[in-house]
Regions:
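Catalytic or ion-translocation cores adjacent to nucleophile or general acid/base/metal-coordination motifs
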Residues: 29-41
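Short Gly/Thr/Asp-enriched flexible loops that form oxyanion-binding sites at enzyme active sites
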Residues: 12-31, 67
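Short gly/pro/ser/thr-enriched loop/turn and capping motifs at secondary-structure boundaries
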Residues: 13, 33-36, 85-89
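N-terminal small/polar loop signature for handling phosphorylated ligands or for N-terminal nucleophile
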Residues: 1-16
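Phosphate-binding and adjacent anionic-ligand microenvironments
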Residues: 1-3, 24-26, 44, 48-175
């Protein structure tokens, strides 16, 4: 296998591991998976002449700014929301109510992705199909998802993200 996909038990988050040239597997971050899918969607829509002039991408405020550089390159608006897919869903509804933008993709660094408007929450099934399609497409060009991620970094710059979890138990945690 060139890639391994896995979801959480309720299938709303997706993790991806990609085989490196030395045969080992590299786990992609939620931000990297999101940017790979974003780049694939925008590239394909542009190549097909189907990239809407009012296209919009939505991400949470804690997700990578690399998405902003990708969106800018494709002339697509990027909107930040508070953390939580309910806010991405609300933004989609706002777009539909006003007709201001056409939703293209939404994601959070916590491995949640949304590429359609018929679901308003993160969707691991749809995301699995999308990243598998991207992996197949790039394999026809002799590239892996790691190769494409390297191309994205080279084109838009390298972005370092670091997630840290701090636990402050009980009453001592309040101090």
């Amino acid at each position: 296998a060139d890639a391994i996909f896995g979801t959480d038990p309720d299938c709303d988050r997706l993790g991806v591991a990609v085989r490196e040239k030395d045969g080992s597997f590299r786990l992609l971050t939620g931000n990297q998976i999101g940017c790979l899918m974003l780049y694939y969607i925008l590239s394909c829509k542009k190549a097909q002449g189907k990239l809407p002039a009012n296209g919009a991408v939505v991400k949470s405020i804690v997700s990578t700014e690399l998405a902003r550089a990708i969106c800018k390159d494709f002339g697509v608006a990027l909107f930040d929301t508070l953390t939580g897919f309910k806010f991405i869903g609300e933004k989609i509804q706002q777009f539909q109510d006003t007709g201001s933008h056409t939703f293209l993709f939404g994601f959070e660094e916590s491995y949640g992705y949304l590429s359609s408007t018929f679901v308003r929450d993160k969707d691991g099934v749809n995301a699995s199909l999308l990243i598998a399609e991207a992996a197949c497409y790039y394999s026809t060009q002799g590239k892996t998802l790691c190769d494409v991620m390297a191309e994205i970094f080279q084109r838009y710059g390298y972005y370092l993200e670091h997630v840290e979890s701090t636990t402050l138990p009980g009453i001592d945690g309040l101090k």
